[in-house]
Amino acid sequence: MLQTSVRKPINVVVWGENRHEQTDPSIAARYPDGMHGAIKQGIEEYLGGGASVSTVTLDDPEHGLTEELLAATDVLLWWGHAAHEEVDDEVVERVHRHVLAGLGLIVLHSGHFSKIFKKLMGTSCSLRWRGETDRELVWTIDPTHPITTGVPHPLIIDSQEMYGEFFDIPAPDELVFISSFGGGEVFRSGCTWKRGHGRIFFFSPGDQEYPVYFQPAIRRVIANAVEWAVTSRPERTSPQLSRVYSGEFFPEFDPDGNAIKGTVAI
């Protein structure tokens, strides 16, 4: 009899800065459950029981990103804007360590300037922007990429902030989307990288002044990215510097990641 395995739900955490929603009545009205809440709803809408989604915010203890929570999380989504510098460096180091060990990370919109994204990219992550209502066309560059499944070409956002080049990021492993704007600007709006064992996706649409995260196609991109960002490994460990010996292949390792002499000799 054929044995079928049931895939466990993806454990997803949406991290939201949640400052605009508390200080700007128009944004609070636009996102009554917070921007993080709208992002969570979109993932649940498209992935259903395939994902278990929770939210944490900047003002939670340890910004909600405890060691225990990160260890149990498959994919972390990050939206921040006005309070990047309030994120504790110890928490940034913790998230960084988990990404290198296999945590998937999806960075949204102005999260490009977050401490964690800049640390993982190793660049300033600066860009050009125009805070006026513009029309954004999100063009699919790689129609075979799983993040683009079911996404219209182009994806049209009628009202959005402009992001433009030069975007100071390392060359993406994969360029998934490019956006164009009414002023003639273009922007690398969907990019992937691997860092250590972790997968990273940056997706630029999502300014707080517009209801972008309620748009079905945007929700589809984010849900697709959640599925893509999952890594399947027996345990979450970071890559290690490891000494090996002549005549040995796939040796056993000690707790520090060093090969144990005399194991699995060939």
Label for each model-derived stretch:
Residues M1-I10, A38, G42-Y46, K261-I266:
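Basic/polar N-terminal segments that are highly enriched at the extreme N-terminus
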Residues K8-R30:
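Short glycine-rich His-centered loop
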Residues V13-E17, L108, F203:
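Short hydrophobic segments within beta-strands
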Residues E17, G80-H81, G206, V230:
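Cell-envelope and extracellular/periplasmic
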Residues T23-D24, E209-A217:
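A short acidic/glycine-rich loop-to-helix N-cap element
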Residues D24-S114:
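Helical hinge/lid and interdomain linker segments adjacent to catalytic or ligand-binding clefts
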Residues A51-S52, A71, L127-S204, S238-P239, ...:
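Catalytic beta-strand/loop cores that center a nucleophilic Ser/Cys/Thr
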Residues A83-V151:
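A glycine-rich, often tryptophan-bearing local segment used as a flexible ligand/cofactor-contacting loop or short
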